[in-house]
């Protein structure tokens, strides 16, 4: 196991902002929280807080991908990906968790990966991850929620039938209470040279596509203010 029970509170994916789980399988690690979907053999969402002090560039040795001991049904074996032509795409990026060996290693649970086209993973998806780090440097603490859109009839890989999402989402939030600002991105799982702004959508739209209520513990007024429209002007691209 890569997790240390003693540090689980360091996760601080503020519990008041955690999404709903459509599966009831919420798993807390030391530095991120996820909701696992057994039928799709991956997380429907991964949520974590990114702080400026997390933004280090320490060299870390990549560990092996291992099954998540906290997922009751066991997460998929990494060998499902072998020979599939798809990358083991991190949801919580290893690059956001270089500040400690444990935090870094924890991103190598197979509950934190999803089959991604290599050009997408190394291309526009990587650009978005880098932009999130840029925003953290500029604005301070961010809450990040990310996952594939898990639908019926997706292509599957491996003996355990790991689903291959056709699109991915990422929600980034900063600020507290009435000062909160959030962006939602929804992008097809293929490389694109388009600017990231082209993939901005209201968070409401991501909720419709996924069936997830992203800020379920917040008031309806707060949710409709944050989720109903795109407010890209509040963020520097």
Where are these regions (language model features)?
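Domain-level detector for secreted/extracellular nuclease and nuclease-toxin modules, and
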Residues: 1-237
